[in-house]
Amino acid sequence: MSTDLELLAAYKPVIMQDKKEPFIITAMGCTIFRETKKSDSFPKREIVINKKEVDFAIEYAIWYDFDIQHLYELEHVWVYVDYHGRVIKVEASFHGKFLNMVDLDNGELILENGTHPVVYAQPGKHALVPDPRVIRVIPAWLESCQEMAGADGVLVQDMFADQIHTDEDLQKMTETYIKEVFGFKPSMEFVPFTLENEKLMSWEELKQSIPDRVNKQIAVIKDYFHK
């Protein structure tokens, strides 16, 4: 396990966040792929390991307690490493899909200290892009942080449907809470957020903790309206 933790720390991504971003990353759930296999945390995709070039890939499932439009968020970075320990490809999640993380001007990887991918988070929404210029072409990127804040209430993914529950009242409370407490105007100035190594964990550990994390925030929201 210690070897795995050292590996996870060695390739941990640097997330560039807006200076006014109201949410922080509180955990990364990690999976090391040494062969082609379907992702458990991003079930719509298979992580393909071309053994001629790739020794392993690390999936970082990035946890936020909130998205600016709904309760809780999970984004992903995939780092592909060759047999010499060099990063040869980086992908990251973008609104349910994924993009290659390369410099838009020269197509090269963007790495800090040679092994840490640098990616940019859409303000409030946290979709990941390789260049902050891309954010301005995303529909409603600004409105989602202001008048559209909280619009989606509590999201309940199928894998947690038996442990996270919502209703019409909670949906309305969550929308109002997010808009009142977290609504903001992005600065479009970005600063690095690097998660402490002790907050790296296996995906299974993070997955097991998610219902408790979400239900704690639901309790905070309910308290907000019943002071």
Predicted segments, located by residue:
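Short N-terminal edge-element motif at the start of the domain
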Residues: 4-90, 98-99
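Domain-length functional cores that host ligand/cofactor binding and catalytic or interaction surfaces
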Residues: 71-76, 83-227
